């Protein structure tokens, strides 16, 4: 009987072959997910903005880039939710309204810096964080609504609202509303707390009715001759005059003349909507691409068309109903400086009984 012993020199070859096969298989397994990610990019957006505004932006962005946007809509509590989710949060981009909300995101350490030549070229320096942790997208101005037939067509300042000539002629919503506490905080940043208290008491003395309702009700009461002037946001003018709120609101909007007031030592008070890149964004490159789209001409046009806000990008198209309001010259006071006075503004409203 013959016995065959395997050749000793073949064993190393077999081992080498098996080793190469395992390496090839491992490389293949690593490569497949990478290919999948390149083909199917996505962005996770958390926002408090209305679906009717956000969805056209998403459709246009996806059509342009092929990147899918998964959106979580919420009424409020964006910072609280992202903070609670921690490092496991799927959020890439956070979109919100009110500069105080953007600063809250930064203060809670929920955003990461973005360095983008596109964003920095489109958004003026005073409308973005110096470290790139948030960027404004659109602006709403705090305006004066005035009766066309009872108030002379001339420039006005916020300071003049305390002038006795307006006694019994001013309508305004609650002083505790964020629109007004932001304005009061800006006044404090310009003039100090003591001067602001004197001003607020003067405005209160000039009220035609209790500080209540909303900005559109200010226009309604001007039409009804309950008051002659009042404070309201710019986008409500477009909303009313467009007829989107119904025929009654269209009448209110067309009954007023709009004044772009300024501080005596500054510009028009504005607030903003804006975006930030989440600290633990799982898709940062695609997220930045989405943020850059939002400040492109197309993104700014969609924002303006659907929300009656002023674009942040110079020369970007705006809705005709907003363009006709005149040239906006935003106050240059840094928002971080204004934010320091938000609590003091609220306490002042309470202390003097402004809403009583």
Where are these regions (language model features)?
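A bilobed periplasmic-binding-protein/Venus flytrap-type ligand-binding module shared by bacterial periplasmic
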Residues: 143-150, 270-283, 302-303
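Sec/Tat signal peptide C-region and signal peptidase I cleavage site
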Residues: 34-40
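A structural signal for short loop-to-beta-strand junctions that line the ligand-binding cleft
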Residues: 89-94, 112-144, 159, 170-172
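Extracellular/periplasmic juxtamembrane helices and adjacent flexible linkers that interface
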Residues: 293, 297-356
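Short beta-strand->loop
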Residues: 46-49, 112-120, 130-131, 134-135, 146-148, 153, 159, 247-269, ...
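Ligand-binding pocket segment of bilobal, Venus flytrap-like solute-binding proteins
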Residues: 186, 191-261
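Early extracytoplasmic/lumenal segment of secretory-pathway proteins
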Residues: 41-103
